[in-house]
């Protein structure tokens, strides 16, 4: 498995709405993530800084990257644009993090 971590932002007034939309996520989005090899996906909220820290284990970069081109992912991104900063393609503004320590 490949471990990934990334940081996103959430609008200051949208913490509760962001959480509501993820509890649960759409069943079809969950199915796409799983069918593309995503495991143990978690998102954490830092309310003080309006940051979201996400971790996910993936089977391959290729399969993970393919999620973005699915219809359900495109719809999800559009759905989330009012609660978080987004790029021109509606994907969330994010920064990938470099792993510096891991204790198996």
Curated annotation (Swiss-Prot):
In which pathway does this enzyme or protein participate?
Answer: Carbohydrate metabolism; L-rhamnose metabolism
* GO cellular component labels: cytoplasm
EC number in record: 5.1.3.32
Sorted alphabetically, which keywords does the UniProt record give? Answer: Carbohydrate metabolism, Cytoplasm, Isomerase, Rhamnose metabolism
Query: Which InterPro entries does this chain map to?
Result: Dimeric_a/b-barrel, L-rhamnose_mutarotase, Rham/fucose_mutarotase
Q: Which residues form the active site?
A: 22 (proton donor)
Show the GO MF annotations: L-rhamnose mutarotase activity
Q: Which reaction does it catalyse?
A: alpha-L-rhamnose = beta-L-rhamnose
Write down the superkingdom of origin: Bacteria
What NCBIfam families has UniProt attached to this entry? YiiL_rotase
The protein's assembly and partners: Homodimer.
User: What's the protein here called?
Assistant: L-rhamnose mutarotase
Q: Which gene encodes it?
A: rhaM
């Amino acid at each position: 498995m490949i471990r990934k971590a990334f940081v996103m932002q959430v609008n200051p007034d949208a913490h509760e709405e962001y959480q509501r939309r993820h509890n649960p996520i759409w069943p079809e989005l969950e199915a796409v993530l799983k069918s593309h090899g995503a495991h143990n996906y978690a998102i954490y909220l830092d309310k003080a800084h309006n940051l979201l820290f996400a971790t996910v284990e993936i089977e391959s970069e290729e399969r993970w990257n393919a999620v973005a081109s699915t219809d359900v992912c495109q719809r999800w991104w559009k759905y989330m644009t009012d609660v978080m900063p987004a790029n021109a393609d509606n994907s969330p503004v994010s920064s990938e993090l470099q792993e510096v320590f891991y204790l198996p």
